[in-house]
Regions:
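Short aromatic/hydrophobic "clamp" motif used to bind/position activated sugar donors
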Residues: 17
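Conserved small/polar residues in nucleotide/adenosyl-binding loops
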Residues: 1-9, 209-215
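Basic/Trp-rich segment in TM-proximal cytosolic loops or flexible interdomain/linker regions
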Residues: 91-92, 152-211
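Acidic donor-diphosphate engagement hotspot in glycosyltransferases and nucleotidyltransferases
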Residues: 29-31
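Long helical/loop segments within the catalytic core of UDP-sugar-dependent glycosyltransferases
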Residues: 7, 33-119, 162-165, 169, ...
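Acidic donor-binding loop at a coil-to-helix junction in glycosyltransferase catalytic cores
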Residues: 120-126
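Catalytic donor-sugar/metal-binding loop of nucleotide-sugar-dependent glycosyltransferases
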Residues: 129-146
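The conserved acidic donor/metal-binding loop of glycosyltransferases
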Residues: 21-25
């Protein structure tokens, strides 16, 4: 989907290219906030929005493990985008654009290899292109909010995190010759982020949820 949209952009007349997941929902001012950020800083060529789960949908679940899973997921997204990536944005160390909501200046995208379908994490691949090949800043627009449905169940959450892990490893391998090496653990933020994600961040909601589930006698 994303790859086809980017390729179709060759024939577009617009100044910006914005990718959105079809099953999410934009906050009413999200696009205005993002384009305003682009217009106010011509040095920015790619940004990710802030992704959150829909709070109203979380309240529909019965109190207990089911609701707790969705509450933990919401807090994880809030921490990742409104705190973690916002701070990383200031240091130009955002690991990946969000596949659910990201935006580019068309001029920057047309210099890239576009989305790569050899990996299941095309969003991470184009992020690495921007950072390592084109030397672009990758930033977060904190007030450009995009809401997604809460995860369906623990199995879906596990599958989602497994897919993210696999994708990040695939992309890392593709960029091993672009300073993405283990020897750069203490100097390259992407290496540190990869190691952290594969030890603490990705399994966190699954682990928290299992700790709260009642055990059989």
């Amino acid at each position: 989907g994303s790859e086809m949209c980017i390729r179709d952009s060759y024939n577009s007349d617009g100044k910006y290219i914005i990718n959105l997941d079809s099953d999410g929902m934009l906050e009413k001012n999200a696009l205005v906030n993002m384009i305003t950020r682009f217009e106010n800083d011509t040095a920015i060529n790619c940004m990710t929005g802030s992704i959150l789960t829909v709070p109203e949908q979380i309240k529909k679940y019965k109190a207990g493990p089911s609701r707790l899973l969705r509450e933990l997921e919401f807090m994880e997204y809030a921490q990742a985008f409104l705190a973690g990536r916002s701070y990383a944005s200031e240091l130009n160390s955002v690991y990946t654009l969000s596949g659910a909501f990201s935006a580019f200046r068309k001029s920057a995208v047309l210099k890239s290899w576009m989305y790569n379908t050899d990996t299941i994490c095309e969003d991470t691949h184009i992020t690495f292109q921007m950072r390592y090949l084109q030397k672009e800043r990758v930033e977060v627009c904190e007030d450009a909010l995009f809401f997604v449905d809460p995860i369906e169940n623990v199995n879906k959450l596990y599958t989602q995190r497994q897919r993210w892990q696999r994708g990040s490893l695939e992309v890392s391998k593709m960029f091993m010759d672009k300073s993405f090496k283990v020897k750069n653990l203490f100097t390259n933020i992407s290496v540190k982020t990869l190691l952290y994600d594969h030890t603490f961040a990705f399994p966190r909601p699954v682990s928290y949820t299992h700790l709260t589930l009642p055990t059989k006698a």
